[in-house]
Amino acid sequence: MTLNITSKQMDITPAIREHLEERLAKLGKWQTQLISPHFVLNKVPNGFSVEASIGTPLGNLLASATSDDMYKAINEVEEKLERQLNKLQHKSESRRADERLKDSFEN
């Protein structure tokens, strides 16, 4: 898996790259294929902005966060991506439950 990182108005240090790779590896526990993850790191007037876009077989994941600390923004983006991935993984299960309830009310 190739991790694409784009930065605007700042340099990407090895520590930032390593932190991004660690946080992306945490998404691996969902056992789904992550297709072309792309992160955009920006320096904005009130701190740092991180945007992420990752494709999966279930759909696309998009998240962004702004913070005064780059690592904090990266962590927030990872948490948002994890929530979205959890939602996508369990979407079919929740729809199945709705059908069972619908059938029981019709009878």
From Swiss-Prot:
Record region (Disordered): 85-107
Expression triggers: By environmental stress and during stationary phase.
Pfam families according to UniProt: Ribosomal_S30AE (PF02482)
Sorted UniProt keywords: Stress response, Translation regulation
Taxonomy, superkingdom: Bacteria
InterPro entries associated with the record: HPF/YfiA_ribosome-assoc, RHF-like, RHF/RaiA
Listed SUPFAM superfamilies: Ribosome binding protein Y (YfiA homologue) (SSF69754)
One of the GO biological process terms: negative regulation of translational elongation
Listed GO MF terms: ribosomal small subunit binding
GO cellular component: cytosolic small ribosomal subunit
SUBUNIT field: Associates mainly with 70S ribosomes.
Job of this protein: During stationary phase, prevents 70S dimer formation, probably in order to regulate translation efficiency during transition between the exponential and the stationary phases. In addition, during environmental stress such as cold shock or excessive cell density at stationary phase, stabilizes the 70S ribosome against dissociation, inhibits translation initiation and increase translation accuracy. When normal growth conditions are restored, is quickly released from the ribosome.
Membership in a protein family: Belongs to the HPF/YfiA ribosome-associated protein family. YfiA subfamily.
NCBIfam families: yfiA
Protein name: Ribosome-associated factor Y
Species this chain originates from: Haemophilus influenzae (strain ATCC 51907 / DSM 11121 / KW20 / Rd)
Upper lineage: Bacteria, Pseudomonadati, Pseudomonadota, Gammaproteobacteria, Pasteurellales
